Each structure stands twice: as C-alpha cells, then as structure tokens.
Amino acid sequence: MTATLERRESSNLWGRFCDWVTSTENRLYIGWFGVLMIPTLLTATSVFIIAFIAAPPVDIDGIREPVSGSLLYGNNIISGAIVPTSAAIGLHFYPIWEAASLDEWLYNGGPYEMIVLHFLLGVACYMGREWELSFRLGMRPWIAVAYSAPVAAATAVFLIYPIGQGSFSDGMPLGISGTFNFMIVFQAEHNILMHPFHMLGVAGVFGGSLFSAMHGSLVTSSLIRETTENESANAGYKFGQEEETYNIVAAHGYFGRLIFQYASFNNSRSLHFFLAAWPVVGIWFTALGISTMAFNLNGFNFNQSVVDSQGRVINTWADIINRANLGMEVMHERNAHNFPLDLASVEAPSINA
C-alpha cells in the first residue's frame, strides 16, 4: 500500500512538472526545448564573460606563439576576443577533462570550443522553443522558420567552416576586431565578395533594411488619427483593438504613384510574408555560401589576366582584387607561413599557348 502511494505521488509530481514546463501561462515560456536551452546558453554566456575578462593567451596557430584576447591581458572592448581553439587540437572534442591540467586547457583555447558548442546547441533549442510555443498557442510555425536564418549563419561560421578547414582555429573569434579579422582572411582565402551566394545575402540584408524602413514609414505616415492635433497620434491606438490602425489603401495609393501601381502590395498578408522572406532567404544563401567555401569551393576567380595581342596585361578590377587578396593573405598568420598559399602553389598555365 505504501509503495502504491509513493508511486502515485511521484507520478503526480512528474505530471505537475510536465504541466509547468509546457504551460503557456508562465511569464516566460519554458517548454521541453527550453529545458536544454537554459543550461546551454547560461554556460556559454558565463564562460564567455569570464574568458573575455581573464583568459590567458591562446596558442591559436599551434606554433608556440600565444595570442592574448582578454581584457586583463592588455585588450580593450574593441580588440578583445575569445581566441579560437589551437590548431594543435584541430577538430578534436576538447572538454576540460581531456587536458592534462586547467592551464593546458586554457593555453590550447578550450573555452572557445566550450562556448561555441554550447551556444549552437542553445540557439538551436531557442528555435525549437519558438516552434513549440507556436504549436501550444495554435499559431503557424513561421517564426521558427525565420529564426533558422541566423541559426544557419552562426552554425556556418562556428562549426561548418572549421570542419571544412580541418580545425577550430579557423573559426570566427568571439570579439569585434576578431570578427573583422575573420572577414578579411575569409576574403583573402576564398574571394567571398565574388561568390553569388554572398551577393544574395547582401541583397537580403540591405534589401530587408530598405523594405523595413519603407514599410514602417508608410504605415506611420498613413495612421488613422483618433486623437486631437495636440496629442500624439500614437495615443490613439488601444492594444487589441479590432479596427485597422492605418489606412492600407492610402499607403498603397501613395506608393503606387511614387513608383508604379504594381510595385505596391494591396494585400497585407502577402506584404508581411515578403518582408519576412526576403532577408531570411538571403541569409540562408549566405550560410550556404560559407558552408561551400568551407570546403574550398570558392568565389569566382580571375587569375588569368586579360592580355593584348603583345601579351601585355590589361588591368581590370579583378587584378586589383587579386592583388588585395594576396596582400591580406601575406599578413595572415605571418609566422606560420613563409608564403601565401596562392604564391606557393603551382604556377597557373598560360592561356597564350
């Protein structure tokens, strides 16, 4: 009898826990994805803050030349970063217990791998939590689909690119100047500016900014005034009101006359789908581009210069880009390589033969 009561009580306890986790009445929804998201993101955030402030220098290139990234070792907010895991570790899973000591783990950049892997798991669970909450509320699932774009981008630079290049040391440093350094080196080694998928990403980001500004300004300019001239127009809106808060016909008419009729949406639903889809698809393509360049399927190159009938080079913009890429590659890991990889490789065949 006692065992039966204990079993029933424990099952009730588990049931109450399940109800609490999946309840949409909580101030912040937890959900089953949140059960994994909360500890992983807390771990990533805590280790990032501690390492950004106090981590010792890391031997990023595996050549016994440690690079300092923390504030206590001479950096500021701009130059500081979590330095990626050493090339000596490569792609090995490197938790604290795999190192001989904590000092060795820090010297080899263990915190970077710890932060990145927990962060990626955490943001993936955040995306799942968005879907889960939408499901519980009877909403459509497109919020999680939209969030998949930044998740894909983060996964590309923190996981797919290191896998393709063979080492976590090639991942993006976790800092402001480290991000810019990653971008410059990426251009030098992969010519990303000449990759069509990056171009689509640029169109997505800048186009999304343009469309967001256009939409916001059109709505703000065509509000249906519910207040006097002495009050803010914003005060005329009541949360949850059934009436339209702006005149979409007026906005449609304005924009249709500003450009041409069919450049303007007359359907609010298709308009907002477009506003969401444009940047999301662009960032998807950029993440896909990073993932292909990770395995050295690079942007277009024009290594063969245009020459005249006498064999003299006719300089084009491609030649300037090539020279800039070589210059950036020479400066990258200057003590790890004697020559940039392009100059050390076999000479390109002549096209005059």
UniProtKB/Swiss-Prot annotation:
Chlorophyll a ChlzD1 binds at H118. Chlorophyll a PD1 binds at H198. InterPro entries: D1/D2, Photo_II_D1/D2_sf, Photo_RC_L/M, Photo_RC_L/M_CS, PSII_D1. GO terms for biological process: photosynthetic electron transport in photosystem II; response to herbicide. It is a multi-pass membrane protein. The modification Phosphothreonine is found at T2. It is found in: Plastid, Chloroplast thylakoid membrane. [CaMn4O5] cluster binds at D170, E189, H332, E333, D342, A344. The D1/D2 heterodimer binds P680, chlorophylls that are the primary electron donor of PSII, and subsequent electron acceptors. It shares a non-heme iron and each subunit binds pheophytin, quinone, additional chlorophylls, carotenoids and lipids. D1 provides most of the ligands for the Mn4-Ca-O5 cluster of the oxygen-evolving complex (OEC). There is also a Cl(-1) ion associated with D1 and D2, which is required for oxygen evolution. The PSII complex binds additional chlorophylls, carotenoids and specific lipids. It is an enzyme of class 1 (oxidoreductase). Fe cation binds at H215, H272. This is Photosystem II protein D1. It comes from Chara vulgaris.
